Amino acid sequence: MGKGVFINTGCHFQDQGGITLGDGTFLGNNVVLTTMNHDFDPEHRSTTYPAPIVTGKNVWIGSSVTIVPGVTIGDGAIVGAGSVVTKDVPPYTIVAGVPARVIRKFDPKTDHLPSTHKKTHEDK
């Protein structure tokens, strides 16, 4: 686990395949990281297949996201709340949905991402 990692409440880790969280990774509440899969064939379902989950630096994973075995999430990526991540996420990419799809890519040095802070009536 990297430095400055934040894990919110209700997260579940099934880690037989290994989980690596890069520096500054932020997990919203109720995130599920599962690193074990099994065969579809009923006769072979008792055979399990572990695969690691890896996040780069400064990754933000929204609330109630599920990440399946073998996924790598690149530096600075953002995963929208409620998403199911079944494929690798490139660095500096926003993904969301079931299954998660690319919403947009961004350059952290030049793109302005909107704040998640909602203004009140008193804010100007």
What do the PLM-derived regions correspond to, one by one?
Residues 6, 74, 78-80, 84, ...:
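A generic "structured core" feature
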Residues 1-72, 98-99, 104-116:
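Flexible, glycine/small-residue-enriched loop-and-beta-strand segment within the central core
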Residues 90-91, 96-99:
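Acidic, glycine-centered active-site loop in nucleotide-sugar glycosyltransferases
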Residues 117-124:
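Leloir-type glycosyltransferase catalytic cores
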Residues 62, 68, 80, 85-86:
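Short hydrophobic beta-strand segments in globular cytosolic domains
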